[in-house]
Each structure stands twice: as structure tokens, then as C-alpha cells.
């Protein structure tokens, strides 16, 4: 008897085959290929030969791990078993839940053994060869199947059934097109007519869930709804079983599935990225969604803060430009206009044109070395459009503060505060493009040269010198020409048409230098005058000393003679009183004098110290009150800051929700238009059918006679006698 496939065999071998088959590199737009893990008993023995160039396969205690490791590990291809042996000997851990956990432990162990990204390939191979033995060395293979080859060659050599089975008819094996899902159990083998019936359950198998594509894990969010319809079941002719095989192993091929964009996304990838590029250049009109209503909140925020003019007339601002700047950056080099700093604790400037018209208000927030990524996000919270200077961008790269700053859907980044200066400084835009396309750790590996060149120019003194030269030599009309429309050539046209000489309007830096130069000249004049006066006074002092010296000498001699001839009475009073009045009387007089001195001293001390004591107590009470009040104010300030951060986060969440609702409204409108068009088509078709039916009914009604006897009626001729007597053959009755 011939044996048919059993559903249990299809389920087990299908799962194993999907888990052991690596996903193609172009299956999804993600950067890293998907890791897979499955029991070794369910995978092929030559799985390491099927890995693509950017993946490695490791066999850890019968569990296969396939995925994309760090780039520097790819050079050790062929030493996978050596690395696994080293990991098992050093750590002792034999189970890992994910490929990333296994790679992390492997990299740590290799670092302990002296293998790091900077280690040469020769030294690394010498260290890994210490863990080579007869069990870990790879077996020789005559042929190596390339990645992407068809599995039909292996199917031809893999038999299933037993020696007693022969002439087995071909069956229709199910080919699944859709996400990995398990088969439902069946009581009996399916027949040929039932081979195309969907036999997929809605609950995925744990093995399939573990070996699913990374594209489905990273590109589709966890909150995305599951597919509403079951995947279709295709058919594939399988080869007849070979009598030499002892196992039943049919293959189930799962075609690739590209991830879809999130349903709440504002637009497709091309329009979304062109929109971000337009805002980065300070040109919202370059966005494909400009004026469509899908970015109305971004457009309102931009035109409310940034300088813009229409037909040469500047619009007044209603909000401030929030700009992140380097700790030592000069904001005056960010615009062709002049900046005037306002008085206050915050660093704010008023941007004025050459005609002294205020066109914007700039609030500068400085980056600090002690900041973290969370501090940067707190600074940007609540602002849908934020400016980041080129030097600030380079500073964030150096201090690793770029995660999540350039990739928020509910925020647009402008690389400066002046569209003209932004378009003439493309190095900052290049840095923005790199950080928008890649995370910083990924950019250091896959965009290293682009990042290196952009950072080198932005951090060089030539970057500031170029902006300073442009500010001094650009014509005064360039701003109105560049911001009045969306034409990219308007700026260059304004420069070519300008016949004016370089602007002599002083910049804040030039005015400061002029003031310092004038002050220096005045100080030099004062120093010269003081030096002359000092010399004159020195000569006068020398002359006076020469005149006074003889007189002072004579006075000194006279005082010396007087001191020798006279004695101070105060030093001889007690002996005099003792000799004149007696010792007891002299002692009593001295005691009374000491007592009077103490009374006078105490009285004076009390009169002076009492007001000071009262004043000190009053000041201490006031200081205690002020300290308590200051503590209350600090607590209130902390609460207000917390509420402000919470409100900012809620605003960001609401902005994200608004964006999602706008996208859903747009889709509903499109669906409504589609339904209306379809209904109109159906109505027109029904009206046409009704019209045709009415015409047909009218035509039939007109063909009927209106009066009895108005239509001639001819009877058929009567049959002849010969026709009635014609014999009928019995054989003709069966025709």
C-alpha cells in the first residue's frame, strides 16, 4: 500500500525547516539580518554553509543560533566551533534565550582572552586554535551549497517512507504564504481533494515564534493588529519517496513577507523623509505635504517663530526659536541679521534686519558636558519645531547625546535659524542626514567616512570663518529673495543680480572689537599721562627729602636729649604714692582706679552690645523665616517643573495622537471617496438596466395587437395522406 503524508509530520518538519532556513538579506528594509534559533535535531547538519556573508551560525549544545554579529566577528568565519568551545569552557553557561544574549556573552569571553576589535586576525586565530580538538573541528565537505539555491536538489536525495513503499503517487504539499503559523491537528490523513484546504491555526507555534523574522519583530510595532485573513495555501509537487530513506521529512517553504508601514504614519517613507529634509533646510515649502493639512501644526509652529517674508515684507513673529547650541558657539554667526541680547537670566536674542525691524526672537539653550540624553529630551519637550546648530550636532555626537533626537515623528529639526545660512553650510546638513539614517553606534560602523568628514569640517575653525565671510559679503537683499518663495535658485539669483559692495553693517562681534579698540586707545593715553605725572611727583618727593633730611636729623637729636633728661610720670606714680602716702593707701587708690575702669568698661560694653544683640536676634529670626520661605519656593519649583515636564510629555503624546487621528481621517476620507465612487457606478449601472428593461417592456407592449382580428392569421397546411402513412423505423427512435 502507498503511504500518504500525515499532518503531524508536516507540522513538525515544516517548523523545523522554517527555523533552520535563514532569511534572505533583502527580505526587509531593516539593517541587521534576523537571528534564528531551533533545536539541532530539527535542523540540517550543513546549516553553517547556508549562512549569508553577513551572518554566522553557532551550534551550542544542539541549539543552532544564526544571525548577524558585530562586523569585526565576521573575519573569524570558520572558527565558529572554536568560539563555542571557548565560551562553554570559560563561562559554563549552555543555554541562551536569544541570539543577542549569546553574542554578548561570546564577545565578553573573547575580550577576556585578549580578542578585541583591534586585535589582528593572525593573533585572534592563534588564540582560537587553542580550543580546537577532534570534536570541534569542522568536517570536510565535497560541495558547498550557495545561499539562495533551490532546496529541490536536497529533496531529490531525501527519501521518506520505508523499503516496502514503492510507486507512491505524488501529493499536493501545502506551501504557506504568510506569517509563520502552526497547523491544526487532524484525525485522518488529508485526501487529494482536501490538500488545498486551509489547515492553519491562529496561534503560532513557540518554535516558529522564536525563529520568526527580525523584520516582523522590529518593523511592525507590538500594538499593530494581527492579520484579519488567513494566509493562502498554495500547492507544490513533491518528489516520490525513495525506498532507501527511513524518515518522513517533507519541506514547507515560507515565502518572505515585507513589513508594512504603521497605519498611523503620516505618509509613506519618501514623502516623510523629504518633509524632514525640507524642514532641516529651513524650507517647509519643499515638503510634499506642504499645504495639504497633514503637517499644519508643524507649519504653524515654523512660521510663528522663524523669519519669513512675502513680496519683501517681513512678518512679525509670535513665538520664539528654540535652538540648541554648543557651549562656546557665537549665535551671531547663525544668521545674516543682527542679534541683540535681552536682559534676563535666560539667553535670548532679538533678531533685527538692517532696517531695525524685529523678525524673530531666539532662545539659546546651551549643551553641557554633564548632560545625558534624557536631559536633552527634556529640553526639547513641548516644542514641535526645534533648531540645532552644526556645532551643537557635532557636540552631541562627541558626547553620545543623539539617540532619539533626530528621529521623532512628532518633531521637525531645523539645522539653524536662518535658511540662507543653512543652505550655504551643507556640512551641518550632511551630519543631519547621517544621524537621521543611522543610529550613532551604527553610523560609526556603516557611515564612518561620511561621519568623519562632516565632523572634521564642522569642528574646524574654517566653518566659523566661512559663515563670517558670508555674513560680511552677502548682499542685503538676499534674505527677501530667499524667503519669498520656494525656488531654490532665488538665493543665487539675488547674489548675481546684486551690484552693491559688501555690506558695511557692523556685526555684534565687529562692534565689540571696535569698542575694545577705542577703550584700549583711551587707556593707553591715560597710562602715558599718569606715567608723566608720576615722574614729576617722584622728582618733587626726592627734592623734599633732600630738604627735610638735615632738619629731621637735628630734630632727632633734640628729642633724644629730651627723652634722656625727662621721665614719664605714669611709670613712677605708684612708687611716688607709696613713698608719700604709704603702701596701704597707694594700694587702695590703685584698687579704686581698677574698679572705676571696670565699671566704665562694662557700661560702655553694655551700651554698645545690647543693640547689637537685639539686631542679631532679629536678623537670625528673619534669616530663619527666609530659609523656610526659600525651601517652600524650592519645593513649589520642583513640583512645577515636574508638572511642566509631565504636561510637555502629555503634549507630545497628544501631538502623536493628533498625527495618528489625522492619518486615520485621511484614510477614512479616501475610503469614503472610494465607496461613493463605487456606489455611483452601481447606481448608474442599475439605472441603465432599468432603462433597458423599460424599453424592452415598451417594445413588447407595442408588438401586441390592440384590437381583436386586426392581425391576419394563417393556419399551417394540413398533412397529406402519404405523410401520415409513413412508417417509422424503431432504430431511429434512439437517435
From Swiss-Prot:
Gene that this polypeptide is encoded by: S4
Gene Ontology terms for molecular function: RNA binding
Similarity comment: Belongs to the aquareoviridae NS1 protein family.
Domain of life the protein comes from: Viruses
Amino acid composition bias (Basic and acidic residues), ranges on this chain: 254-274
Membrane spanning residue stretches: none
Role this protein plays: Non-structural protein with ssRNA-binding activity. Is probably involved in the formation of viral inclusions, where the assembly of cores and the replication of viral RNA are thought to occur.
Keyword Transferase: no
UniProt lineage: Viruses, Riboviria, Orthornavirae, Duplornaviricota, Resentoviricetes
Protein name: Non-structural protein 1
Region described as Disordered: 18-50, 138-170, 218-290
Keywords on record: RNA-binding
Composition bias, Low complexity: 38-47, 218-234
Keyword Protease: no
Bias kind Polar residues: ranges: 235-247
Amino acid at each position: 500500500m502507498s503511504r500518504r503524508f500525515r499532518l503531524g509530520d508536516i507540522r513538525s518538519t515544516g517548523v523545523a525547516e522554517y527555523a533552520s532556513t535563514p532569511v534572505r538579506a533583502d527580505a526587509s528594509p531593516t539593517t541587521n539580518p534576523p537571528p534564528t534559533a531551533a533545536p539541532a535535531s530539527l535542523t540540517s547538519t550543513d546549516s553553517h554553509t547556508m549562512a549569508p556573508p553577513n551572518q554566522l551560525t553557532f551550534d551550542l549544545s544542539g541549539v543552532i543560533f544564526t544571525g548577524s554579529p558585530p562586523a569585526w566577528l565576521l573575519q573569524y568565519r570558520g572558527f565558529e566551533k572554536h568560539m563555542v568551545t571557548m565560551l562553554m569552557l570559560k563561562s559554563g553557561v549552555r543555554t541562551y534565550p536569544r541570539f543577542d544574549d549569546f553574542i554578548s556573552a561570546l564577545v565578553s569571553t573573547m575580550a577576556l582572552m585578549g580578542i578585541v576589535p583591534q586585535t589582528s586576525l593572525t593573533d585572534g586565530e592563534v588564540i582560537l586554535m587553542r580550543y580546537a580538538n577532534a570534536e570541534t573541528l569542522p568536517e570536510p565537505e565535497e560541495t558547498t551549497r550557495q545561499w539562495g539555491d533551490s532546496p529541490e536538489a536536497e529533496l531529490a536525495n531525501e527519501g521518506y517512507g520505508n523499503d516496502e513503499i514503492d510507486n507512491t503517487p505524488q501529493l499536493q504539499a501545502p506551501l504557506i504564504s504568510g506569517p509563520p503559523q502552526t497547523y491544526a491537528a487532524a484525525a485522518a490523513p488529508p485526501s487529494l481533494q482536501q490538500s488545498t484546504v486551509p489547515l492553519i491555526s491562529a496561534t503560532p507555534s513557540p518554535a516558529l515564534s522564536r525563529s520568526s523574522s527580525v523584520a516582523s519583530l522590529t518593523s511592525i510595532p507590538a500594538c499593530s493588529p494581527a492579520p484579519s485573513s488567513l494566509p493562502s495555501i498554495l500547492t507544490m509537487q513533491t518528489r516520490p519517496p525513495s525506498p532507501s530513506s527511513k524518515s518522513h521529512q517533507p519541506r514547507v517553504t515560507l515565502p518572505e513577507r515585507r513589513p508594512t508601514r504603521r497605519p498611523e504614519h503620516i505618509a509613506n517613507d519618501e514623502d516623510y523623509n523629504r518633509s524632514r529634509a525640507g524642514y532641516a533646510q529651513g524650507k517647509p515649502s519643499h515638503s510634499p505635504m506642504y499645504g495639504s493639512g497633514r503637517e499644519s501644526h508643524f507649519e504653524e509652529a515654523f512660521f510663528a517663530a522663524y523669519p519669513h517674508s512675502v513680496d519683501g515684507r517681513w512678518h512679525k513673529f509670535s513665538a520664539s526659536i528654540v535652538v540648541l547650541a554648543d557651549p562656546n558657539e557665537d549665535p551671531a554667526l547663525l544668521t545674516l541679521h543682527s542679534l541683540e541680547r535681552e536682559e534676563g537670566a535666560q539667553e535670548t536674542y532679538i533678531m533685527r534686519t538692517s532696517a531695525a525691524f524685529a523678525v524673530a526672537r531666539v532662545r539659546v539653550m546651551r549643551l553641557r558636558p554633564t548632560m545625558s540624553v534624557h536631559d536633552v529630551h527634556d529640553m526639547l519637550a513641548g516644542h514641535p519645531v526645534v533648531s540645532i546648530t552644526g556645532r551643537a550636532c557635532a557636540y552631541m555626537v562627541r558626547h553620545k547625546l543623539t539617540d532619539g533626537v533626530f528621529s521623532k515623528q512628532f518633531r521637525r529639526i531645523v539645522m539653524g535659524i536662518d535658511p540662507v545660512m543653512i543652505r550655504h553650510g551643507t556640512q551641518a546638513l550632511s551630519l543631519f542626514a547621517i544621524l537621521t539614517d543611522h543610529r550613532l553606534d551604527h553610523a560609526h560602523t556603516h557611515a564612518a567616512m561620511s561621519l568623519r568628514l562632516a565632523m572634521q569640517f564642522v569642528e574646524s575653525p574654517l566653518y566659523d570663518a566661512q559663515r563670517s565671510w558670508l555674513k560680511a559679503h552677502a548682499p542685503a537683499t538676499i534674505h527677501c529673495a530667499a524667503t519669498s518663495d520656494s525656488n531654490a535658485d532665488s538665493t543665487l539669483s539675488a547674489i548675481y543680480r546684486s551690484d552693491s559692495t559688501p555690506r558695511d553693517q557692523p556685526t555684534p562681534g565687529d562692534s565689540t572689537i571696535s569698542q575694545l579698540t577705542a577703550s584700549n586707545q583711551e587707556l593707553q593715553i591715560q597710562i602715558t599721562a599718569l606715567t608723566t605725572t608720576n615722574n614729576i611727583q617722584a622728582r618733587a618727593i626726592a627734592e623734599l627729602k633732600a630738604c627735610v633730611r638735615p632738619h629731621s636729623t637735628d630734630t632727632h637729636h633734640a628729642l633724644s636729649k629730651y627723652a634722656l633728661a625727662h621721665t614719664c610720670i605714669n611709670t613712677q606714680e605708684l612708687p611716688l604714692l607709696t613713698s608719700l602716702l604709704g603702701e596701704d593707701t597707694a594700694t587702695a587708690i590703685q584698687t579704686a582706679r581698677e574698679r572705676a575702669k571696670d565699671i566704665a568698661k562694662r557700661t560702655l560694653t553694655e551700651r554698645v552690645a545690647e543693640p547689637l544683640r537685639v539686631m542679631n536676634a532679629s536678623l537670625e529670626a528673619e534669616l530663619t523665616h527666609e530659609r523656610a520661605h526659600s525651601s517652600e519656593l524650592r519645593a513649589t519649583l520642583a513640583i512645577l517643573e515636574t508638572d511642566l515636564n509631565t504636561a510637555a510629555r502629555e503634549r507630545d503624546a497628544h501631538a502623536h495622537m493628533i498625527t495618528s487621528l489625522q492619518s486615520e481621517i485621511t484614510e477614512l476620507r479616501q475610503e469614503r471617496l472610494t465607496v461613493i465612487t463605487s456606489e455611483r457606478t452601481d447606481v448608474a449601472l442599475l439605472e441603465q438596466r432599468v432603462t433597458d428593461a423599460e424599453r424592452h417592456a415598451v417594445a413588447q407592449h407595442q408588438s401586441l395587437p390592440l384590437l381583436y382580428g386586426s392581425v391576419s392569421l394563417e393556419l399551417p397546411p394540413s398533412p397529406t395522406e402519404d405523410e401520415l402513412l409513413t412508417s417509422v423505423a424503431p432504430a431511429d427512435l434512439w437517435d
